[in-house]
């Protein structure tokens, strides 16, 4: 029987302007639900989830940061030891997309190239209000050399594929990352029994 490998832990920090849907993406991934009541994240929230892959298990530590300017000074310390930075914008809010350049630069300042960056265009369900095309998002990701995907936390669109992309890009996952993204290994999502306390403070983002 194969020996049991130690559980690898990876820190994912979610960044982006206020109200772009960072909390809602995490909530949809963790609990497969969407809360229509908007409640701004205060400071930093933490949750964790175990992902069961083909031949290993990883623990994802999800750090949800506040988008308000008054909390901006807290964020660099959370970026510093992160494995992944997930930078979210609202496809119906062009300014939030433009501001992702600063978020990417902040991550690179703190972590250099030693971090996986994922650019996420959220709220694709707002079709009639879209201000940022998928081509613009893809081009920006190519310019910065980061991963790109569009999602809708409200509709549950591309949430699992987002985390599959992240899992495939993690250190030690070379065999997974060599797989074509559209054929990536299926992930059995189960909530970790050691999820951080504080769930009761979590509010869904109206996205």
From Swiss-Prot:
Modified residues (Cysteine methyl ester): 207
Residues reported in the UniProt entry to bind GTP: 16-23, 64-68, 122-125, 152-153
Keywords annotated in UniProt: ER-Golgi transport, Golgi apparatus, GTP-binding, Lipoprotein, Membrane, Methylation, Nucleotide-binding, Prenylation, Protein transport, Transport
S-geranylgeranyl cysteine lipid attachment residues: 205, 207
Localization in the cell: Golgi apparatus membrane
Top-rank taxon, per record: Eukaryota
Protein's GO biological process: protein transport; vesicle-mediated transport
Family: Belongs to the small GTPase superfamily. Rab family.
Sequence motif Effector region, residues: 38-46
Xref: Pfam families: Ras
Recorded GO MF terms: GTP binding; GTPase activity
Main location: Golgi
Organism the protein comes from: Arabidopsis thaliana (Mouse-ear cress)
Lipid bilayer topology: Lipid-anchor
Function (record text): Protein transport. Regulator of membrane traffic from the Golgi apparatus towards the endoplasmic reticulum (ER).
Chain segments annotated as transmembrane: none
Name of the protein: Ras-related protein RABH1e
């Amino acid at each position: 029987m194969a020996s049991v490998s130690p559980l690898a832990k990876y820190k994912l920090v979610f960044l982006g302007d206020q109200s772009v849907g960072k909390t809602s993406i995490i909530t949809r991934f963790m609990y497969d639900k969407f809360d229509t009541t908007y409640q701004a994240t205060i400071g930093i929230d933490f949750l964790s989830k175990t992902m069961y892959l083909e031949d290993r298990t990883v623990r994802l530590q999800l750090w949800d940061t506040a988008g308000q300017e008054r909390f901006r000074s807290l964020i660099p310390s959370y970026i510093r030891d992160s494995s992944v930075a997930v930078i979210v914008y609202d496809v119906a809010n062009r300014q939030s997309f433009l501001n992702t350049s600063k978020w990417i630069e902040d991550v690179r300042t703190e972590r250099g190239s030693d971090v996986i960056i994922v650019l996420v265009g959220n709220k694709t369900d707002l079709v009639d209000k879209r201000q940022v095309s998928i081509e613009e998002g893809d081009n920006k990701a190519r310019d910065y050399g980061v991963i790109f995907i569009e999602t809708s936390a409200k509709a549950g669109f591309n949430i699992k594929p987002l985390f599959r992309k992240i899992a495939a890009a993690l250190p030690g996952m070379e065999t997974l990352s060599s797989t074509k993204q559209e054929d990536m290994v299926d992930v059995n999502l189960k909530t970790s029994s050691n999820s951080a306390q504080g769930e009761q403070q979590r509010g869904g983002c109206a996205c």
